[in-house]
Regions:
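Catalytic cores of Mg2+-dependent Asp-rich isoprenoid enzymes
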Residues: 1-146, 152, 157-297
């Protein structure tokens, strides 16, 4: 993946990557390209049955470590090596996006967030050669936090495409069209749930940041800036009163510069970014079952 493609398709990642070394940028960009290709199978195909078939073929190729599949070949060429089992989990998560989506429960939502984003945290650990189980638990939390932010930002866009990630147990039996056009009590309920999920994301951002001390110095700063950037999107949604119908939340260039400044200041003056000061909360992984990087207690 070229730097221009990275800038176009992964703006937050491109911004944070400015704090990485050239070696880490190349590896991370190649990993991003693989994740993007997997995601695009579900998102860009008009034939959802064909997309599902292609993802199932990819999943089996990953399980078999069959390098004749171009995505598996690309994954196996990344150095340091990444875990193909983690990519299987990612592919399973993307498979659930082939068609309409209606999540029933909060544990189901958290499993989805783990599969499509917690796995990315684990793959980044692979790139930085982080094997400490505690560090990897925190990496899962950061990925889940970012995905919860994405979901809260994109409620309207997803609903217009037949996807509702807000759990039925929280918002009630609303259809995608009812979410997109919600008014009155239904709109209030959606705002309350978005507020709740962003609060859950904040807990996981805190956990994710507390695990950054396990990373090498340069990646530590880069991932901190990425975390602050995503978290800022949630703050923008909150500042709008959790009005998900008010347009897509994004950070301006000025906000990005302020985030970078905050990241650098935090990096230099926050002890927890350099010394591990706590223990991982296994309750954050409740319902994720026995999967790579999950804190099973």
């Amino acid at each position: 993946m070229s730097k221009e493609q990275l800038k176009k398709y992964g703006t937050t990642f491109h911004f944070a990557s400015q704090f990485l070394s050239a070696k880490h940028i190349e590896s991370a960009a190649n990993l991003y390209a693989i994740c993007r290709q997997i995601d695009d199978i579900a998102d860009t195909s008009d034939d959802k049955e064909q997309a599902k078939h292609d993802l199932l073929v990819l999943k089996q190729a990953l399980i078999d470590e069959d390098a004749s599949h171009p995505i598996v070949e690309a994954a196996k060429s990344i150095e340091p090596a990444i875990c193909l089992e983690t990519l299987v989990e990612l592919t399973d998560g993307v498979l659930s996006d082939t068609g309409s989506v209606r999540l029933h429960s909060e544990p189901e939502l958290m499993r989805y967030c783990y599969q499509v984003a917690g796995t990315v945290g684990l793959l980044m650990c692979d790139l930085f050669e982080i094997t400490n189980p505690i560090a990897r638990h925190h990496a899962v939390d950061l990925g889940v936090a970012m995905q919860l932010t994405n979901i809260c930002r994109d409620v309207l866009e997803d609903a217009e495409n037949g996807r509702v990630y807000l759990p039925e147990t929280l918002i009630g039996p609303m259809s995608a069209s009812e979410v997109a056009g919600a008014t009155g009590a239904n709109a209030d309920r959606i705002r309350d749930v978005v507020n709740y999920l962003l609060t859950e994301a904040d807990v996981r951002y805190e956990s994710g940041v507390s695990g950054l001390c396990f990373l090498p110095t340069q990646p530590r700063l880069a991932i901190l800036v990425a975390a602050l950037s995503y978290r800022e999107i949630g703050m923008i949604v909150a500042d709008r009163g959790f009005d998900i119908w008010a347009g897509r939340a994004f950070t301006s260039k000025t906000q990005k510069l302020l985030i970078a400044f905050k990241g650098v200041m935090t990096f230099f003056f926050s002890r927890r970014l350099h010394v591990y000061q706590g223990a991982h909360d296994s309750s954050l992984h409740r319902g994720l079952l026995r999967r790579p990087g999950v804190h099973w207690a």
